[in-house]
Swiss-Prot record:
Organism encoding this protein: Salmonella typhi
Gene: uvrC
Gene3D superfamilies hit by this protein: 5' to 3' exonuclease, C-terminal subdomain, GIY-YIG endonuclease, UVR domain, UvrC, RNAse H endonuclease domain
A Pfam family per the record: GIY-YIG
Subcellular location: Cytoplasm
Domain GIY-YIG: 16-94
Family the entry assigns: Belongs to the UvrC family.
One function term, GO molecular function aspect: excinuclease ABC activity
Any single biological process term in GO: nucleotide-excision repair
Subunit structure: Interacts with UvrB in an incision complex.
Lineage: Bacteria, Pseudomonadati, Pseudomonadota, Gammaproteobacteria, Enterobacterales
The name this protein goes by in its record: UvrABC system protein C
InterPro entries: GIY-YIG_endonuc (IPR000305), GIY-YIG_endonuc_sf (IPR035901), GIY-YIG_UvrC_Cho (IPR047296), Hlx-hairpin-Hlx_DNA-bd_motif (IPR003583), RuvA_2-like (IPR010994), UVR_dom (IPR001943), UVR_dom_sf (IPR036876), UvrABC_protein_C (IPR050066)
Source domain of life: Bacteria
Length: 610
């Protein structure tokens, strides 16, 4: 217990109502957030002589101050607790590392509806199907749907400006509603309805309707139409035969847990209309000494009560762990959803099979993660030995990417003792430098990254500079000029130059911009972790550069051409079938567009070519 914090005096002021408490250390940082049905009773338990665990002892020893927020109900306390955990990320709480919203398939409410992937708030008019475990699962499903039910997936801006069908129509992946006369309203509406039924799990209805249409087409001697529908029926059957489907039409999430060596894996199966849409493994950050019960309860609360997760609530949640606050959680989720949500821990039949599958996946993923962590730990230990450091708890790496000096992007990737910390990866758009000046770009990104206050835990032990002596010299110069409240001498600056022909294993490392560098054996674990973080940084920089370049490319050059306003721009895109068609057009073809003179056509042609 802290000598400064007077627990007895504090407890005299605490009410017995429900609420949330925040514990602070001497630096004013929130180190733990908790909730209680009875605040006085719960907080008193922290200051007994016989504490429940070493984790609690370590926590109490650091308490300098406690804030209490009283709530009307336990449900309010539960919601507020998880909002505070997300806000403060306290080091003694179990933390869900990835709280990105889940992707859905969106069927728009347009006259000719389109299919698309959607994340975030559901403001757009239309229908949402999901959630899916990740973007890959959505893209894979969209590609499949496009082959079976050819409704459009293009953006409205493209759809509204076409005067002739695109390649998707030519290869049979779209019915071409953008061009009048290619498909009837009735046919397009029918295909949209098939998509709606298919995504709702009503495959039998889709097949029944398609079979009826095929038989009618045969009776009407429309054999080509009958053959096309037959192919569609076969495609639907191929897809549905591969899926494990519960007869009950379950709409639920199944959560399996594995816990070993202080690490937890929570595996979630997403099941809608009896179909497994996919699954995902989570590895929450678990403070030392945390019991499995706290891991599960905190994870489930954060998973459903933080941010946009509450938008994806199923009708039922299956768990392989008996929660002490199961009723409170179910009531809170039901209140949020506006309907009854059941939390079940002892399922039977198909549900028991689902739970066994989730538990097996959690155990398998945990074994893999522990193996990877062991490898990362060995590599970081080897690198610390090479660099003569006691340990490496955090390492950051920088890289620059551009095309002939244009759309320059710098990346910063972060590794900790467990490997990549992707939530902390950052990209920086570089501006105000001579195009192609990588040294100036590195100088700018380092000043932006480190020229400000940094939390003690976020100060890297090693900063890896990709680019060799010149880039390392820039880093040294920046750090020499930094005037910051944290210890700027703590990070070790390390330059890495690519080997001959950029061949992996031939890298040269530099502590100083002058003099000779040194190399590590190709099979060195220390070199492997350097290659890993450098490659991550390189890929992250290139990804950002490509996005920026695509954005510039898509922000049509037409907008910068004098004499081409919104109406002419729309006419050009509509007449030529999009920007690509316009880029490929000759001066004579551009001049045929209504409202475009010969002189303006030449200006547009040369602007797009150069």
């Amino acid at each position: 217990m802290s000598e400064i914090f007077d627990a007895k005096a504090f407890l005299k002021t605490v009410t017995s109502q429900p609420g949330v408490y925040r514990m602070y250390d001497a630096g004013g940082t929130v180190i733990y957030v908790g909730k209680a049905k009875d605040l006085k009773k719960r907080l008193s338990s922290y200051f007994r002589s016989n504490l429940a665990s070493r984790k609690t002892e370590a926590l109490v020893a650091q308490i300098q101050h406690i804030d209490v927020t009283v709530t009307h109900t336990e449900t309010e306390a539960l919601l507020l607790e998880h909002n505070y955990i997300k806000l403060y990320q306290p080091r003694y709480n179990v933390l869900l590392r990835d709280d990105k919203s889940y992707p859905f398939i969106f069927l728009s409410g347009d006259t000719h509806p389109r299919l698309a992937m959607h994340r975030g708030a559901k403001h757009a008019k239309g229908e949402y199907f999901g959630p899916f475990p990740n973007g890959y699962a959505v893209r894979e499903t969209l590609a499949l749907l496009q082959k079976i039910f050819p409704i459009r997936q293009c953006e409205n801006s493209v759809y509204r400006n076409r005067s002739r069908p695109c390649l998707q129509y030519q290869i049979g992946r779209c019915l071409g509603p953008c061009v009048a006369g290619l498909v009837s309203e009735e046919e397009y509406t029918q295909q949209v309805e098939y998509v709606r039924l298919f995504l709702s799990g009503k495959d039998d209805q889709v097949l029944t309707q398609l079979i009826a249409r095929m038989e009618k087409a045969s009776q009407d001697l429309a054999f080509e139409e009958a053959a096309r529908i037959r192919d569609q029926i076969q495609a639907v059957r191929r897809v549905t035969e591969k899926q494990f489907v519960s007869n009950a039409g379950d709409d639920l999430d199944v959560i399996g847990v594995a816990f070993d060596a202080g690490m937890a894996c929570v595996h979630v199966l997403f099941i809608r209309q009896g179909k497994v849409l996919g699954s995902r493994s989570y590895f929450p950050k678990v403070p030392g000494g945390t019991e499995l019960g706290e891991v599960v309860e905190t994870f489930v609360g954060q998973f459903y009560l933080q941010g946009s997760q509450m938008r994806t609530l199923p009708g039922e949640i299956l768990l392989d762990f008996n929660l002490s606050d199961k009723t409170l959680l179910a009531d809170s989720l039901s209140e949020l959803a506006g309907r009854r949500i059941h939390v079940q821990t002892k399922p039977r039949g198909d549900r028991a099979r689902y739970l066994k599958l989730a538990r097996t996946n959690a155990a398998t993923a945990l074994v893999t993660k522990l193996s990877q962590q062991s490898t990362i730990t060995q590599r970081l230990t080897a690198l610390a030995t090479v660099l003569k450091l006691p340990a490496i708890k955090r390492m950051e790496c920088f890289d620059i990417s551009h095309t002939m000096g244009e759309q320059t992007v710098a990346s910063c990737v972060v590794f900790d003792a467990n490997g990549p910390l992707r939530a902390e990866y950052r990209r920086y758009n570089i501006a105000g430098i001579t195009p192609g000046d990588d040294y100036a770009a590195m100088n700018q990104v380092l000043r932006r990254r480190y020229g400000k206050a940094i939390e003690e835990s976020k100060i890297p032990d090693v900063i890896l500079i990709d680019g060799g002596k010149g880039q390392l010299a820039q880093a040294k110069a920046v750090f020499a000029e930094l005037d910051v409240p944290w210890d700027k001498h703590r990070p070790l600056l390390l330059g890495v130059a690519k080997g001959a022909d950029r061949k992996a294993g031939l890298e040269t490392l530099f502590f100083e911009p002058e003099g000779e560098g040194f190399s590590l054996p190709p099979d060195s674990p220390a070199l492997h972790v350097i290659q890993h973080i450098r490659d991550e940084s390189h890929d992250h920089a290139i990804g950002g550069h490509r996005k920026k370049r695509a954005k510039v490319k898509n922000t049509s050059t037409l907008e910068t051409i004098e004499g081409v306003g919104p109406k002419r721009r729309q006419m050009l895109l509509k007449y030529m079938g999009g920007l690509q068609g316009l880029r490929n057009a000759s001066v004579e073809e551009i001049a045929k567009v209504p409202g475009i003179s010969q002189g303006l056509a030449e200006k547009i042609f040369w602007s797009l070519k150069h």
